[in-house]
């Protein structure tokens, strides 16, 4: 072991081979690496060399730092973080699309970790390249701005600005102006609709449930009291008995149309459903029925990418979305469902690239398109799981 650089940390022999069999290992010697909380990070029969061992230990001891270092490789000279990338040929290849979602996630994580340089880079890009009339266009693709915003992304950017203002000061005017712009564009009868055209030519008529970040709305009410009513209506939508698909599938429905007082019956996209559950959990409104269902699915082995309204896995969606596990780890941490948090984090960490050029990434090393959403939500999950 010392030849692999393993010194100064606890080593344990699996004397009765219980762990060997539990993890499904097939050869001797094998190695299992755990973090300080006993979370399994890696189990392998390929014994690492000294450099690989150092990266494995770094993943165990400083997982967020490793992932953040990878993420910073994607940052462009103007502060943009592409929403997709591929890993191939020993290099990271960024995509040509920037989402307000990704930029808002970056701003929020930077504010919460007091990373002033990262926050400044992301905020300057949002302010200078993505903002039109106080709203943030949801996408810039190959340099071309989208015509509309996404109200959740504007809420997330506002949350990041509020947290930055609490740490460094100097953002109150921006918060007030952007909160007023979002209210004027996207609030109808106290309901936050999903989007508005940034030129003022129209808006959506549906409320996307995963956009209902009530906690942020309540924080915004300190700057603009009108957001109190929006928060109250949003909480009422989330707690409406019709918001869950069924007792057999207690996931939140995708959307609600206020004019028709009707919830949609569309299939549940798991990452969106997980975000809705997280927002509900943050205000202690996530039902035990929903949390127990998640526990049961994870206990049975997996939570899949989509579920039809009848509770069956959607055709072509019997795969696991890594971003949903990152969000569900946060749900477990916020709601006190420790087993949900633990199992979700285990699923997440099983996808971590722990060694090599791409250490810290959660994407595919086979050249497939990967999403920075996953790395960013993983960073929030790791923060939420800190003892």
What kind of feature is each model-predicted range?
Residues 4-6, 16-56:
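Thiol/disulfide oxidoreductase modules built on the thioredoxin-like
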């Amino acid at each position: 072991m010392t030849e692999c650089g393993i010194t100064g940390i606890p080593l344990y022999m699996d004397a009765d081979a219980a762990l060997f069999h539990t993890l499904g290992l097939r050869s001797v010697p094998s190695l299992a690496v755990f973090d300080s909380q006993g979370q399994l990070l890696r189990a392998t029969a390929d014994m690492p060399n000294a450099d690989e061992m150092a990266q494995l230990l770094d993943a165990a001891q400083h997982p967020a730092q490793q992932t953040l270092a990878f993420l910073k490789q994607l940052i462009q000279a103007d502060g943009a973080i592409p929403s997709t990338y591929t890993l191939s040929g020993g290099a990271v290849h960024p995509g040509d699309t920037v989402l307000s979602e990704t930029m808002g996630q970056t701003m929020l994580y930077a504010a919460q970790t007091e990373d002033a340089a990262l926050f400044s880079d992301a905020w300057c890009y949002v302010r200078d390249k993505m903002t039109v009339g106080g709203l943030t266009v949801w996408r810039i693709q190959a340099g071309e701005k989208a015509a509309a915003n996404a109200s959740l992304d504007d809420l997330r950017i506002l949350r990041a600005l509020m947290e930055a203002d609490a740490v460094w000061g100097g953002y109150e005017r921006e918060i007030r102006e952007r909160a007023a712009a979002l209210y004027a564009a996207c609030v109808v009868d106290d309901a936050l609709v999903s989007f508005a055209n940034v030129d003022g030519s129209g808006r959506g008529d549906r409320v996307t449930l995963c956009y209902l970040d009530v906690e942020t709305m309540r924080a915004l009410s300190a700057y603009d009291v009108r957001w109190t009513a929006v928060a109250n209506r949003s909480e009422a939508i989330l707690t409406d008995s019709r918001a869950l698909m069924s007792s057999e599938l207690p996931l939140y429905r995708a959307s609600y149309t206020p004019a028709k007082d009707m919830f949609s019956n569309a299939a549940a996209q798991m990452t969106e459903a997980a975000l809705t559950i997280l927002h509900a959990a943050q205000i202690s409104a996530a039902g035990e029925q929903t949390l127990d269902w998640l526990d049961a699915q994870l206990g049975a082995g997996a939570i899949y990418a989509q579920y039809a309204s009848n509770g069956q896995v959607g055709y072509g969606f019997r795969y696991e979305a890594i971003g949903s596990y990152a969000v569900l780890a946060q749900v477990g941490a916020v709601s006190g469902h420790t087993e949900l948090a633990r199992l979700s984090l285990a699923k997440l960490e099983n996808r971590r690239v722990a060694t090599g050029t791409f250490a810290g990434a959660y994407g595919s090393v086979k050249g497939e398109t990967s999403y920075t959403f996953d790395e960013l939500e993983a960073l929030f999950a790791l923060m939420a799981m800190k003892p």
